[in-house]
Amino acid sequence: PGRIYQGRRDAQPERVDLPAASLAKYVDSPMIMGEHLRSWELDSPSDAIHTFDAVAPQAESLELPHARVARFSHMLAESEAIFGPFPWGQYRFLIVLNDDLPGFGLEHRESTFIRYAESTLVNSERSRISMNTVPHEYIHVWVGKLRAQEGLLHDDYHTPGDTRMMWVYEGLTSYYDEVLAARTGLTSFEQFRDGWIATIERYMLQAGRLWKSVEDTGAGLRHLRETSPRFEDLRRRQDYYAEGSLFWMEADAIIRGATDNQRSLDDFARRFFDVAPPDTDGDVVEHTRQDVVDALHAVYSGVDWDALIRERIESPRSTLEFDSLADRLGYRFDFQPEPFTSSDKSSSNGRSANLRSSIGFTVNESGEIRSIIVDSPGWRAGLGYDMKIVGVRTRASGESTTAYSAAALREAVRESADTGQVDLLVEWDGVLRPVTIAYDGGLRYPSLVPVDGKPDFLRAIAEPRTPAPPAPPDSPTLRQTDRPD
């Protein structure tokens, strides 16, 4: 038995009697509590009760729009359309709304534990906040908690697991969290597309891919969790998430293209996770690399999946390009002189500047270089981390050097298409020096351009497979319970 300390409550009465259970069960069973807690029961296609629970410092933060609750219900149906029946007895989304805690999301067999900013629920529909962590952690019901790679889990909490196949555990999950968000309206198609544009651009500029494989980022995950203040493009991070997701997107596009959109990665997922749930707490149905290859081959046998995994996942890349992926989706990845994605449009007038795809670095509002790409035009001109740009020369300023601003720097890069250079005044360790960057490419913003006459598989991937439940404005779609004082 236990007692919640004075002034706090959880979803149970004040006295809590915890049943006898295995250590694995308790480790896998988080709990939230607080003075202000609300719960919504979601409409699930299975018999298992699904509840969305949220706790916040202020009661007014616990207003979840009916449309958002309906999208979460739709997410449950879309998930089962992809992965098969929900395998457990219940599920709870445990949400902590707090501005003072770091963001996190942690999957469990029958729940997930997520922290969001306090205003997230209230603004979720108005500001189109995707809340992608919700579908991401829910997908782990199947990817990681029903099936997981051989050697990842052990009978104790001391033996390190084999994490080389995290490109399945987290890569497949990361791919489908974007897909589920698009299919359920958590994101618009434009947001879905723009997210992939940003991911492709990111990895086209990541030189670490030339020496360190995706598999290797999984093997070294314990050392790569934290960001590095220097040369992260060479060091790499836990890229089995995002670059792993690009492999699964390519697999989806290959299958759709070869079968005239009659089959897809959804067919792989349904086959791969069609296993009997284990009865023992903490157990999973293990899979091997060969199991993945065999399941992909069963859906479409016209590709050497073993070789593709070796090339895309298990080996350093010979090139940083993604031309084949865009082409298979029915698009061309290109750069334009004007912002294309919503993110680039909103940041194009900002006080900081991301010029990684042009002169090769980012600067903050004070002009300090925060990241730089090795062998980029800026790098070749001698620029480096923490150097500070204090002056910029533009034609608009009459060829004189003006004080740094992100707008002036962007203008100088824009003019480089005619001038062939970008002239800066840089301060480093108390010393000022002029720097000329040899560059004539102008501003470059990434885009995905549809190719005439080719099927649009990106849009096909985002199409829902189940009907969306209604969310009338006069009553919640889902039963809501409140625990007032």
Spans of model-derived segments:
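Structured beta-strand-rich cores of soluble
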Residues: 1-48, 60, 70, 74-77
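Carboxylate/His-rich catalytic cores and anion/metal-binding grooves
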Residues: 6, 10-30, 76, 82, ...
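Generic detection of short hydrophobic beta-strand segments and adjacent strand-loop junctions
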Residues: 16-18, 40, 114, 433-439
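Juxtacatalytic substrate-recognition/specificity segment
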Residues: 39-166
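Hydrophobic alpha-helical scaffolding
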Residues: 62-65, 104, 124, 128, ...
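Post-HExxH zinc-binding segment in Zn-dependent metallohydrolases
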Residues: 112-117, 121, 146-147, 158-209
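C-terminal recognition in membrane/secretory proteostasis and scaffolding
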Residues: 177, 187-485
